Design a protein with these regions (language model features):
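Acyl-donor (CoA/ACP) binding surface of acyl/acetyltransferases
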Residues: 2-45, 49-54, 89, 93-199
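A short helix-loop-beta-strand connector motif used in the catalytic cores of GNAT acetyltransferases and
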Residues: 77-91
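Hydrophobic residues in alpha-helical segments
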Residues: 50-51, 60, 82-83
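A short hydrophobic/aromatic micro-motif that marks alpha-helical segments and, especially, helix-coil
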Residues: 67-69, 82, 186
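Conserved GNAT-fold acetyl-CoA-binding loop/helix
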Residues: 57-77
């Protein structure tokens, strides 16, 4: 089994489902959002709404895409990865406008301790409106219901305070600061670690 994470790497999947007829990236509806599988036809919106924006990628590990064709190639790989029942990657679509405004996914798994790492990205036009928290809450609830995961964790650049605020809003607990733990478009950075455990 393999999956493509939000940063474009294909990795081994790692955890079991809990007796569901359907698995993987299922469609999730929230008050304002549709969380769904992404397809190659989404490449223009992904490119325009976040993948080409340096303001979005400042704290991320990948550089802004230079053209929509490269985004299409990435999404083609992602479509292949959906064949795995253990690939979790949602596009975040605004219900009212049907705009694709971001993405959220499981980016790493640690099967031996039943832990997953989650990541998310949102276009700047939709920042500070509660969309990330709404999507994150829905995905975390889904993962705890659908899989045997016991711990979901997230890391963010210590300078990216907004990401920490989202995690706290969604019930994650701050566990500490890891010095020079990560590398992103700002260079080598300190990272904050948050987690949420199964109730």
């Amino acid at each position: 089994m393999f999956r493509l994470d939000i940063y474009g790497k294909i990795e081994k999947s790692c955890f079991t489902q809990k007796g569901r007829d359907t698995m993987g990236t299922e469609r999730i509806l929230t008050e304002r959002l549709i969380l769904r599988k992404m397809v190659v036809a989404d490449h223009i919106q992904m490119f325009r709404h976040w993948a080409n924006d340096p303001a979005v990628t400042t704290y991320l590990t990948w550089e802004p895409y230079e053209n929509a064709e490269d985004v299409a190639a990435y999404l083609a790989l992602n479509e292949q990865a959906y064949q795995s029942e253990e690939h979790f990657y949602w596009g975040i679509e605004e219900k009212e406008t049907r705009h694709l405004i971001g993405a959220i996914s499981v980016v790493r798994c640690h099967p031996e301790i039943k832990t997953m790492e989650i990541g998310y990205v949102l276009g700047t036009d939709w920042w500070h409106q509660g969309y990330t928290a709404e999507a994150l809450t829905a995905v975390v609830d889904y993962l705890f219901a659908a899989t045997s995961v016991q711990r979901i964790e997230a890391f963010h650049d210590a300078e990216n305070k907004n990401s920490g605020n989202v995690l706290k809003k969604c019930g994650f607990t701050y566990e500490g600061l890891l010095k020079q733990r990560g590398k992103n478009n700002r260079g080598i950075v300190d990272e904050c670690l948050y987690s949420r455990l199964r109730d």
